[in-house]
Amino acid sequence: MYTTPAPPEITRRSSEPSTQQGTLGSLEGEKGHLLFPGFVVLVTIFLVVIVTCILWSRKKQKKRRVPYLQVTPSLALPPPRQRAKNIYDFLPRQQTELGRHQLSGFSTESLLSRASDSPEPEVPQASGSLQKHRASVHAVEYTVGVYDNGTVAQMCGPLASSAHRVCDGTSRNNSISSKESNDYVNIPTAEDTSETLTCTKSTPESHLGLPSGQRLEFAEGGHAGCGKATDRTGVWAPGLQGSNSLSEGDDSSQSSNDYVNMTGLDLEDIQESRPRVAFQCCRDYENVPPVVANGSQLQTVEEVTSSTTDRGEPAQRTLPSVYHMAFRPSAWSEDGAMIPGEEASNGDSSDYENVLVPELEGKDWKQGPGTWHPSDERTPSDQAGKFCEAVYPAGSLATETSGEEV
């Protein structure tokens, strides 16, 4: 059969919608391919950010934990032991003290409790030593005190009226003393007690060490002013120039000026070489101004025995204590008077001060073993190395005689 061809306008209209459908499908496919990779990229970026944040936070936490290490207690360690109970705390006080001495082991609590409950053992020992010293002092019967120059005037009274005195024997023995102390009392040893008691009964004179070279002369009862010059009670403290009777060492003081040790002192040699001069016992050594000696101002203390008088025995009464001064005459005039202005000083002692020697014209002087009188035939040069003595009344020196002078 024979067909007829279609016109060209109809063929063009039918082909246009098919091409339009093909383009729309291709466009949708391309859009789907483009959205998937973009979404994947966004997800990966987000994950990376999250991971970096986590790592940064962990680093900060690690840095903070390094200086502060936290020690976690382990549960495997055993629990601490309980302290042992002190069974003696429940006992009475006496049983507690007895039980604590029997402990083989100790703890800090027991040591603290012992220290608080234990009494101090030093107190009874100190009291016992004081009682021993008191007992020894009362056995010898002399008072213990501190030597002081200001109390010398107060000491003169009780020394003059004392019935028990320390004799010459105790001064020759060693004394218990301290070489570096300025205030102390010489206490004789136990071996000297028997000799001290016997000497006080047998000998009429006794010697006591007084500070800084003082010498006290005092009379007691009816013995005052009677007898020879050697029967007087007196004390001579060394310290004058040229004294060799003391030995170097323990017999003398090396660093003190308030006392004089009488150990190793031979008083007889000192009395023979150095006569004594009496002064009123009031203060320490002072300057004595020159006195114009006359009958009322200068009085001699004469000791006259029974063989020097025919009418009666004269008796004298002096004050209980006087000063003693020894000086050396330096120059004499032809008529028997000492040249004024001469001074006698002591080179070895720092406690003495220079004393002016008074005039001797027509005055009575107490002659000692080494004195020189104007009536003597010897010259003053023979007596240059010896001492002379004089009596100076201080205040009122009462001298009474019960008989007429020859």
UniProtKB/Swiss-Prot annotation:
Keyword Amino-acid biosynthesis (UniProt): no
Main location: membrane
Residue intervals on the Cytoplasmic side: 55-406
GO biological process terms on file: adaptive immune response; antigen receptor-mediated signaling pathway; B cell activation; immune response; intracellular signal transduction; lymphocyte activation; negative regulation of MAPK cascade; negative regulation of T cell activation
Disordered: annotated span: 1-25, 109-131, 219-258, 358-406
Keywords, sorted A to Z: Adaptive immunity, Cell membrane, Immunity, Membrane, Phosphoprotein, Signal-anchor, Transmembrane, Transmembrane helix
Compositionally biased region (Low complexity): 242-258
Positions in the Extracellular compartment: 1-33
Signal sequence region: none
Subcellular location: Cell membrane
Bilayer topology term: Single-pass type III membrane protein
Membrane spanning residue stretches: 34-54
UniProt-recorded Gene Ontology molecular function terms: protein kinase binding; SH2 domain binding
GO cellular component, one term: plasma membrane
Post-translational modification: Phosphorylated on tyrosines upon TCR or BCR activation; which leads to the recruitment of GRB2, PIK3R1 and GRAP2.
PTM sites of type Phosphotyrosine: Y184, Y259, Y285, Y352
Subunit structure: When phosphorylated, interacts with GRB2, PIK3R1 and GRAP2.
Stated role: Negatively regulates TCR (T-cell antigen receptor)-mediated signaling in T-cells and BCR (B-cell antigen receptor)-mediated signaling in B-cells.
Protein name: Lymphocyte transmembrane adapter 1
